[in-house]
Curated annotation (Swiss-Prot):
InterPro entries: Glyco_hydro_1 (IPR001360), Glyco_hydro_1_N_CS (IPR033132), Glycoside_hydrolase_SF (IPR017853). The keyword Hydrolase applies. Keywords: Disulfide bond, Glycoprotein, Glycosidase, Hydrolase, Signal. Belongs to the glycosyl hydrolase 1 family. A beta-D-glucoside binds at Q39, H140, N185, E186, Y329, E402, W452, E459, W460, F468. Gene3D superfamilies: Glycosidases. This is Beta-glucosidase 25. Residues 1-19 form the signal peptide. One of its GO terms (biological process) is carbohydrate metabolic process. Glycans are attached at N107, N478. Disulfide bonds join C205-C213. It comes from Oryza sativa subsp. japonica. The keyword Signal applies.
Amino acid sequence: MSLLTLVHILVSFSACVEAISRADFPPGFIFGTASSAYQYEGAVNEGQRGPTIWDTLTKRPGRVIDFSNADVAVDHYHRYKEDVELMNDIGMDAYRFSISWSRIFPNGTGEPNEEGLSYYNSLIDALLDKGIEPYVTLFHWDLPQALEDRYGGWLNSEIIEDFVQYAFTCFKEFGDRVKHWITFNEPYNFAIDGYDLGIQAPGRCSILSHVFCREGKSSTEPYIVAHNILLAHAGAFRAYEQHFKNEQGGLIGIALNSRWYEPFSNADEDTEAAARAMDFELGWFLDPLMFGHYPPSMQKLAGDRLPQFSTHASKLVSGSLDFVGINHYTTLYARNDRLRIRKLVMDDASTDSAVIPTAYRHGKKIGETAASSWLHIVPWGMFKLMKHVKEKYGNPPVVITENGMDDANHPFSRLEDVLQDDKRIQYHNDYMSNLLDAIRKEGCNVHGYFVWSLLDNWEWNSGYTVRFGLYYIDYKNNLTRIPKASVQWFSQVLAQKTAII
C-alpha cells in the first residue's frame, strides 16, 4: 500500500467520523429552514397588504447599504409552491415563516383581510401536503405603519390589546393546522436596533444628540418597547391557553436572539461582566418569562428607567411559554467597563450593562468572520449557550429557531465559486456538532434546528449585499433558485438514518 493511498484512506475515515447525520440526534428531532415575511414575500402592494414600518424606513436615504428595499425580495408570495418543493427535496421536516400583520390587518386592526388569510392558508396547506410542519412567527419586526402613526406603535401599551387580537385571529384561522407558534422574533434586536441605535425600523434614537435620528430616547424607549412586547406575548399565550389549547393542542414559544459571552479573562470582574452581558441580552426576556421579573443586574443598573411588573403582570408573564426559541449565530468576549466611558458617550440602554463586548483578545480574533462583520464563527459558543440555558432556567424545551452564516454578494464572483459554499457546510457541521454535544453530554433539552436560510434574501440594513441561503438567488435573472453545495450536504445529513460511529 502506497503512502498516498494510506493518507487518502485516513482522510476519508476522518471525514466519516466527523460527519453528522439526522440519526445522531434524538428521535423526533426537527430540522427546518427559517424565513420572515418582509425578507421573503415581496408583493408589498398586492393582496390588500398595508404598509409597514420597514416599508417606511427603506425610503429614508442611507438606511440600507445598497439603497434597496424588499418590494420584490425573493417573490415568495408568488413562488411559495416552488420553494416548498425545494424544502421537500432537501428533506426538511419543518418551515418557520412569519405572518405579515399588515396582510391580515392592513390598518393594524379592524376586520381581517380575506386575501391575506387566503395566502397563508394556501402556504400552510402546501407545506402540509409535503409533510412539512409549519412553525409560524406572528411578529418579525414588520409592524403595520398605521399603528406606528396612530399611537406610536410599541411605545404605547395600547398595542398589547391589538397584538393579542391579531394573534387570536391567527389562532382561530390557522390553528387547526399550525401546532407551533412563535409570538415574537428577536425582541432584543427589535428594541435595541429600532429604539436605541436607530439603525432599524422605526429608526428612533437619541445617541450623540440625535445625529442619526430625528426623534427618540435611547436610554428609556428600548425598555418600554421590550416591556410591552413581553406583556403582549403573555396576553397571546393566555388567550391561546384559554380559548384554543384544549381543542388545537398547539405549543407557543418566542424566538430570542442570544450571543454567548465568554469572559475576557479569568478575573472576577470579567466573569461578572460576561454574566451581566447574558442578563442584558437573553435574560432581559427569558428571566421575566421564567421567573416573572427582570434580572437583578438590570434592575440595579437601569434603575427606574426599567419598567416593573405588577403582581398581576408578573403572574401573567411567568411561565407563559411552552418552548424557548433561540436564534444563535456568534460569540464575543465580555470585558468589564470599569470607567463607564461608553455609557458617558452613548447614554443609552445598550451600555447600561457596563460591559465592553469584543471579538479580540491579546490581538487574536475569537473566530473567523463571515461576510457580516458581526458574525464571528465560534461553534463552541453553541455548546456553552445551551448549557447556560439548562443550568439557569431549569432545562426548558429549546428549539434553535435560527442559525446560519453569510457570504458576500460580490458582483464579479464566478457562479461556480459562489455555489461551492464549503465554509457554510463547515459552519453548520460544527455548530450542529456542538449542539449535539450539549444534548448528549449535558442533557440539554433541545428539540429542533432551523437553518437561516433556505434562500438568499433581503437582509435588512445589508440589503442584497450578503447571502445566507442554501439556494443562490439570481437577482438579475428571474430570481432563479440555484442549489449551492450545502443543499446536497444537508440532503445527505437528513437522509442518513443510521448513526455514524
